[in-house]
Amino acid sequence: MAGRHPVEEAFLAGRRALRLLVTPGRRDALERLVLHATTLRIPVVEIEGGSLTAVTGFDGHQGVALVAAARAPAAPADILARAIEQGEAALVLALDSLEDPQNVGTLLRSAEAAGVHGVVFPTRRQAPLSPAAIKASAGATEHLLLAPVDDLPGTLADMHVRGLRVVGTDAGASLTYREADLQGPLVIVIGSEGRGLAPAVRRRCDLLVRIPMRGRIGSLNAAVAGSVLLFEAAAQRGPGPARAGGQPNQTS
């Protein structure tokens, strides 16, 4: 993973780190991360910016990357168990074949901030959790249960059987998101940027809602639309437990 916030969140989450990579010109600015790594006896390796870009696969690394042990993927059942443990109605985000890593990362960041218990997404035809997606999430991936599934429609059907309502977005829906009841156990499904919800996924939705547009642009992108729905669901559920932070960060 690369970028200051993802590395910070990985340390906070206790991810097993193997080494910290920093560019010499940014080492002073990254002093806190370097000190933290040194305290944990994690090797700190200096690497030129161009080489770090080659290692991470993108140039938005901010001069720092963390080589860490891979996290074991979660299962949908783990997400529901977390909600039960926290004494809350389950709130799940489902991604239906999104293609843009930035949209994926932004949605994960919004999901974590809105109190989502976990995210399900297909193992195929889905933008990977690349360094770019992880950086766009500002490290939210370290705190979310992420469950890749082979059969997204089947997973949604199973969650419906377990008592969760499945809500998707559709510009032609008769009900607006503000009119919809988004309390109780819920899955919010966000379709791909170009095609929206796949037909098989749409058939698994108990409810379709739209976000009214007042300007000339006819739709929002997937990340913005999903964030609107997630925070509407959070608002309808009332205030959750207090968390550290909570202020917008314009530099991430």
Regions from the language model: what does each represent?
Residues 48, 69, 96, 122-123, ...:
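Short beta->alpha connector loops at strand-helix junctions that form conserved
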Residues 55-70, 137-140, 183-191:
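Short basic, glycine-rich beta-strand/loop surfaces that mediate nucleic-acid
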